[in-house]
Amino acid sequence: MLSKAHAKINLSLDVIGKRKDGYHLLKMLMQTIDLYDLIEIKKIKKDIIIDCDREYIPKDRRNLAYKAASLFLDRYNIDSGVRINITKNIPVAAGLAGGSTDAATVLKIMRDIFEPDISNEELKEIALDIGADVPFCIEGGTALCEGIGEKITSIKNFKNQILVLVKPNFGLSTKDVYNNLKVEKIYIHPNTTKLIQSIEEDNLESVARNMRNVLENVTLRKYKTLNSIKSNFIELGALGSMMSGSGPSVFGLFDDMLKAQICYDNMKEKYKEVFITRTI
């Protein structure tokens, strides 16, 4: 069984506190985009086997797709295994939920193969044990995600919007970025309410003005390349530009495909991983 595993971007990312167990409390507006990996799963007699077209992708429990399959098989006492083939298109360690969306897609395919009556809500319970972005990736679309990612409220779909996405030639550790964030020193927070209102009113310029990611407080200071990419996007006609998730991917939001294509061509001269895509 073959399925697409779509990446996500953040239209906003706010950190509003930190729990005693170390988890940060988040308020994020998440959006699925039309950039995806391909996941194919076949039922086998035993074990979990991961195949991938990228040699650097781990094939063991470090891979979230493996973890998803293992949790699913254990939870439902399934006495067989799966072979998972992953074709990667989403950049790795990029703030685009590449591993999380693969895991979510594995859960959905395995439901179809083994336990078709399981609800999305039940899948999200398993998903939260894998990672904060995985529950959102079960549903996709446009949603406000709060807590540690478990509180998901769907809003009007912000679909068919034009994006150019740049992944610079380095990856970032989500854990390291959050560990270097000083919550008490976040002085400007996203106006998430205004951002949602702008989406509901189809006001693209207001959406662009209200996009904000507090993790840029960490990354923009350390990686000047990210400042340069954001500035280049605005110079090349983007309505707004922001880092997605914990980075380092940066996207520009456009209202015109010709401008987006010119921007893409320009960025492609400087960076290897550049994409034109849309929200879905």
From Swiss-Prot:
GO BP annotation list: isopentenyl diphosphate biosynthetic process, methylerythritol 4-phosphate pathway; terpenoid biosynthetic process
Record bears the keyword Nucleotide-binding: yes
Transmembrane segments: none
EC number(s) given by UniProt: 2.7.1.148
Domain of life: Bacteria
Pfam family, one: GHMP_kinases_N
Binding site for ATP: 91-101
Function: Catalyzes the phosphorylation of the position 2 hydroxy group of 4-diphosphocytidyl-2C-methyl-D-erythritol.
HAMAP family: IspE (MF_00061)
Protein name: 4-diphosphocytidyl-2-C-methyl-D-erythritol kinase
Classification lineage: Bacteria, Bacillati, Bacillota, Clostridia, Eubacteriales
Gene that specifies this protein: ispE
